[in-house]
Amino acid sequence: MFKTLSKSIGFLVAIIALVKGDTYTCSQMQSLAEGYFRGPTLTTMLCISYYESTYNTQAINPTSKAAGLFQILPEHCGELCKTCTTPSDLLNPTINTECAKSILNSQGFKAWTTYASGDCKNWNKCVAPSASTHAASTHGSTGPSTHGSTTHGSTTSTTYTSGASSGLFDFKANNGGGQDMVKYF
C-alpha cells in the first residue's frame, strides 16, 4: 500500500512539474533555442541543456549554484550576460538561453563540462529541426552542403544548405588569441 501511494505521489509531483512548465520537452527546447542558435550549433546546445538540466528551467546545482536550462554560473550575471541582473534571473528560460549564447560566444562549447567530456558526441535525442528533417531525407545527401565561404581579414562566413532550407548558419571571427568566436544570424 505504501509503495503504491509513494509511486502515485511521485507520479503526481512529476505531472505538476510538467504542468507548471518547469521541464521543457524537446520541441519546446527547439523552439526556444532556435532564436539563438542555428544548425549543428543548435543541436549541440540542445544536447548541452539536456545533460546540464534535463531541460528543467528551475534546475540549480547545489554546489556551484549554476542555474537554469544551461546551468549558468551566477557570476556571469551582469558580466558576460547583461540581461541577467540577479542569480534568480537565470531561472527565466529566455534569459538563461541569452546567457548561454553570450558564454558560447566568449568561451566556446568547452565552457560546459558535459561538452568537454564528450557527452554530445553523436547526440541524436533532440536535434535541430532542419537536421532532423535532413536526416529523414531519402534523397541520398550525406550532410549539409557548403555554398560559399567568404573571408574578410580574420572573419569568415560560410553559407550552408540542409534539406530544403538554406541560410547563414554561423560566422566565425578569430579574436586574435587563436580561439574562434561564433556569431549567429
UniProtKB/Swiss-Prot annotation:
Disulfide bonds join 47-126, 77-84, 81-99. Gene3D superfamilies: 1.10.530.10. Residues 137-158 are annotated as: Disordered. SUPFAM superfamilies: Lysozyme-like. It comes from the Eukaryota. One of its GO terms (molecular function) is lysozyme activity. The active site is at residue 52. Keywords: Disulfide bond, Signal. The keyword Lipid biosynthesis does not apply. Pfam families: Lys. Residues 1-21 form the signal peptide. Belongs to the glycosyl hydrolase 22 family. PANTHER family: LYSOZYME C. This is Lysozyme C-like protein DDB_G0291137. It comes from Dictyostelium discoideum.
